[in-house]
From Swiss-Prot:
Taxonomic lineage: Eukaryota, Metazoa, Chordata, Craniata, Vertebrata
Topology in the lipid bilayer: Multi-pass membrane protein
Chief place of localization: membrane
Membrane spanning residue stretches: 12-32, 44-64, 77-97, 125-145, 172-192, 203-223, 238-258, 265-285, 287-307, 331-351, 358-378
Signal sequence, start to end: none
Protein name as annotated: RH-like protein IIR
GO terms for MF: ammonium channel activity
A single GO cellular-component term on record: plasma membrane
Role summary: May be part of an oligomeric complex which is likely to have a transport or channel function in the erythrocyte membrane.
Pfam family, one: Ammonium_transp
Chain segments annotated as coiled-coil in the UniProt record: none
Keywords: Membrane, Transmembrane, Transmembrane helix
Family that this chain belongs to: Belongs to the ammonium transporter (TC 2.A.49) family. Rh subfamily.
InterPro entries: Ammonium/urea_transptr (IPR029020), NH4_transpt_AmtB-like_dom (IPR024041), RhesusRHD (IPR002229)
Amino acid sequence: MSSKYPRSVRRCLPLCALTLEAALILLFYFFTQYDASLEDQKGLVASYQVGQDLTVMAAIGFGFLTSSFRRHSWSSVAFSLFMLALGVQWAILLDGFLSQFPPGKVVITLFSIRLATTSALSVLISVDAVLGKVNLVQLVVMVLVEVTALGTVRMVISNIFNTDYHMNLMHIYVFAAYFGLSVAWCLPKPLPKGTEDKDQIATIPSLSAMLGALFLWMFWPSFNSALLRSPIERKNAVFNTYYAVAVSVVTAISGSSLAHPQGKISMSYMHNAVLAGGVAVGTSCHLIPSPWLAMVLGLVAGLISVGGAKYLPGCCNRVLGIPHSSVMGSNFSWLGLLGEIIYIVLVVRHTIWNGNGMIGFQVLLRIGEFSLATTIALTSGLLTGLLLNLKIWKAPHEAKYFDDQVFWKFPHLAVGF
């Protein structure tokens, strides 16, 4: 006898997704136009390459990074692509509407596509905490709310604190982490008895997740430098990120071996620890004056990530119901906080070096930005979690958590489940 849960998704998903897509097409028809300026060909190619790197990070990197579940790897990869495609469309419109007053035609440029892709990346980070417990209709709601909340944070911080695009982007780590953890806290937590093994990682899916981590590792310098305008700052960001993630790999392997009683290396530790340096230096990557400092940050971040992978999953599983293998959000929250602290220290150093006496004011500004982003992330995440609990979304039953068979057609299982 087949389950009733796929049938409910079949009724809700096409209506919801296609109606939303039709609405987006109409909005693009009435309110958007392409940039008609004659851009330098060399600059156009360079800008496209950065955008291409971001798309690879999002579609392949984060898509496969979340695919380590034993019975939920198909959904993790495909749902991530679905959220990316939807999130980019909505983010382009939202960023255009919020950046101009009174609202008019949204001019689409390669830079606006890069900005929209970074907004969609926020969803791919936060969804790690809830994948396996929600269906695509709920993910549609989550994408719309989170992209809107992040766009609002960017606009408010930019207007109040006069912050540039790069600094707004670097709040994404903390924002996405706390948003995802807040949503997870509102969802049903424990798995039913007899199904606890479904949220465990398996060998082949874990290898796919490592493939995603490798793509992220290769393209993280492009992500940290994507929205910087100055060529010198972009160069510094690329160099410092490269050194930081290189040290993170060495630290991840060594720390994982050290954390195991028999000195064995854990693949689950590797998935996020190899990226730790890139997250930690993201906020200040263009300000770090020397490679040794970036390398030290990569070392510290790698140790924090390995320690978090060892000790945080038990706490997150008990309190938030997050699977032991889904520690990206909790890791990114600590690493993002470390990055914010390093940025404040470097800003203070720069202020003293230039003889500017307003050190306290600069520190208060940075703390204000961080506090505002965190507050909006927690608030909007809680509201989203409560919204996703409504019965109208036809959420999968707890017994069907972390199960591809709820959503996918398996030719060798014609009878159902």
